Regions:
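Charged, alpha-helical interface segments at or near domain boundaries
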Residues: 2-186
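C-terminal, beta-strand-rich globular interaction domains
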Residues: 172-276
Length: 276
């Protein structure tokens, strides 16, 4: 039976303090579930139902170290088709995409993807939203120790030569997941579309004056959005691809802002868009 694996390291930055066992276990369970489910989706290009959890993509505990609690674990893929797909795309690309989906679930701008990772992601366009929805509760579980004890948690991919930091969760990312509010009054922004999923109407924009992109979706059912608006968003992404700053074209977007407990905008719910 073909078996492939990817090595990871999870570190709870607790300093000299002992880690509460219950909170630590819930945090690790969240990481295990989010990573395994995301991997299953990437390698099968399907989203498993909440009633089924793949036995052939599992996280296995390895050795642990004491002090800022560090836990090594191995993601083991025993299904021959998924194993072959992992060998084809490589551990690095898989890790990029795991990071991408978990960052999106946290309303955090993901790191830029390599061309190879972008190519794999493009084939998942129809299920991107479903993957994020599927892991959302696991991502909340990942934050148990950050919410309870304010400890950051860092995930790294391990290789024989070095470790690669994938992402960090902390109080700030936790604030994006709990007690979100949506403004009752709409706002107008000038923005460019930086990523757009034509199947779901979601993804990211960069508003004038901002340094990071913010996710968006339409406030109503995507099936009810006018074709002209969908085309406008898609064309803006295409028109601004690899052009000089002075040639960038912006859209005037009306939206309701979704905010975290700090008042920061984590998502725009779009009501309308037009050319200025």
């Amino acid at each position: 039976m073909a078996v492939t694996d990817v090595d990871f390291e999870l570190k709870i930055e607790s300093g000299a303090n002992l880690v509460d066992m219950e909170y630590g276990l819930e945090t690790m369970t969240g990481f295990s579930g989010a990573i395994a489910i995301t991997t299953d989706c990437i390698l099968s290009n399907e989203v498993p139902s909440k009633m089924s959890y793949s036995d052939n993509v599992r996280a296995k505990l390895m050795g642990a170290c004491i002090g800022s609690y560090k836990q090594d674990f191995k993601l083991v893929i025993s299904d021959p088709v998924k194993s072959a797909n992992l060998k084809r795309i490589g551990n690095s690309v898989l890790s990029e995409l795991i990071t991408y989906f978990i960052c999106e679930a946290m309303y955090v701008e993901p790191p830029a993807l390599t061309k190879k990772a972008e190519k794999v992601l493009s084939k998942m366009e129809k299920i991107e939203n479903k993957v994020i929805d599927r892991i959302s509760e696991r991502v909340k579980d990942m934050h148990k120790i950050s919410r309870s004890n304010k400890y950051p948690v860092v995930l790294k991919r391990k290789t024989k030569l070095r470790n690669f930091k994938l992402f960090e969760i902390n109080e700030n990312t936790a604030s994006n997941l709990f007690n979100l509010t949506t403004d009752s009054n709409s706002i107008e922004i000038d923005a460019i579309v930086t990523r757009f999923n034509s199947f779901t109407g979601n993804w990211r924009l960069l508003a004038d004056g901002d340094s990071v992109t913010i996710p968006f979706s339409f406030s109503g059912p995507y099936s009810k959005v006018k074709a002209s608006i969908k085309r406008l968003m898609s064309e803006n992404l295409h028109d601004n691809n690899a052009v000089a700053d002075e040639l960038i074209t912006r859209l005037k977007i009306t939206a309701n802002a979704k905010r975290n407990t700090s008042g920061d905008i984590v998502k725009y719910m779009i009501l309308g868009a037009s050319k200025p």
